[in-house]
């Protein structure tokens, strides 16, 4: 039995996907992809699935995702799904299509939130100075 493991990251969210032969079921933390809320996050996760519909029809995917927020997790999941299906099929044309559509389907976005420093409300903003 063929098994492929893949992962994706976005900020502090990490998704790990396991691909096995099956009937096309995709579960995110044991929840079917079709009923994930909010809808915007679901649509974002569906992008690699829609682009490679016939490849996903014979594969069951279990994704465990932790850390981060809702959209960060959605980005991590879509990266894990895209990388995994490419490893499963080995299709160069699909890789080209993913890269042309959105490079972050294949490459994790390593940008992180800048740390807040003292003397202000955020990473760069400073408290207002008064001279009188």
From Swiss-Prot:
PROSITE patterns: RIBOSOMAL_S9. GO terms for molecular function: RNA binding; structural constituent of ribosome. Keywords: Ribonucleoprotein, Ribosomal protein. Gene3D superfamilies: 3.30.230.10. One of its GO terms (biological process) is maturation of SSU-rRNA from tricistronic rRNA transcript (SSU-rRNA, 5.8S rRNA, LSU-rRNA). It comes from the Archaea. Belongs to the universal ribosomal protein uS9 family. This is Small ribosomal subunit protein uS9.
């Amino acid at each position: 039995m063929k098994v492929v493991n893949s992962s994706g990251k976005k900020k502090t969210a990490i998704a790990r996907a396991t691909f096995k032969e099956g009937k096309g079921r995709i579960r995110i933390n044991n929840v079917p992809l079709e009923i994930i809320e909010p809808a915007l996050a679901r649509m974002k996760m569906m992008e690699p699935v829609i682009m490679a519909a016939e490849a996903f029809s014979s594969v069951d995917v279990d994704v465990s995702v932790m850390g981060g927020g809702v959209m960060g997790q959605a980005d991590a999941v879509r990266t894990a799904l895209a990388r995994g299906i490419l490893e499963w099929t080995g299709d160069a044309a699909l890789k080209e299509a993913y890269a042309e559509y959105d490079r972050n389907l294949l490459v994790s976005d390593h940008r992180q939130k800048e740390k807040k420093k003292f003397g202000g409300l955020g990473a760069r903003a400073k408290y207002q100075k008064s001279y009188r």
